[in-house]
Amino acid sequence: MIIPVRCFSCGRVIASDYVRFTEACTKIINETGREPRGEEKAKILDDLGVKRYCCRRMILSHKDLIDEVLPY
């Protein structure tokens, strides 16, 4: 629903990285008109300094559902 502030496994702060990750993905969508590919997402995460696979999992697997749940 809401991106966790810290990684569940290692405790690293990831909320700020998630915001920058979504901004970079939106930029790719606006420039190319398509979703970013896996290699592009990997490069974005590398550029953000997200090296651990547990933190990468937290960012890549998050689905923002707050707007759908908020009316209830």
UniProtKB/Swiss-Prot annotation:
Listed InterPro entries: RNA_pol_su_RPB10, RNA_pol_suN_Zn-BS, RPABC5/Rpb10
Disulphide bridges, residue numbers: none
Flavoprotein as UniProt keyword: no
Keyword Nucleotidyltransferase attributed: yes
Record-listed E.C. numbers: 2.7.7.6
Pfam families the UniProt entry points to: RNA_pol_N (PF01194)
UniProt binding sites for Zn(2+): 7, 10, 54-55
Reactions listed under catalytic activity: RNA(n) + a ribonucleoside 5'-triphosphate = RNA(n+1) + diphosphate
Cofactor binding, per record: Binds 1 zinc ion.
Location within or outside the cell: Cytoplasm
Gene Ontology MF term list: DNA binding; DNA-directed RNA polymerase activity; zinc ion binding
NCBIfam families cross-referenced by the UniProt entry: PRK04016.1 (NF003089)
Function: DNA-dependent RNA polymerase (RNAP) catalyzes the transcription of DNA into RNA using the four ribonucleoside triphosphates as substrates.
Similarity comment: family membership: Belongs to the archaeal Rpo10/eukaryotic RPB10 RNA polymerase subunit family.
Name listed for the protein in its UniProt record: DNA-directed RNA polymerase subunit Rpo10
Organism: Picrophilus torridus (strain ATCC 700027 / DSM 9790 / JCM 10055 / NBRC 100828 / KAW 2/3)
Gene for this chain: rpo10
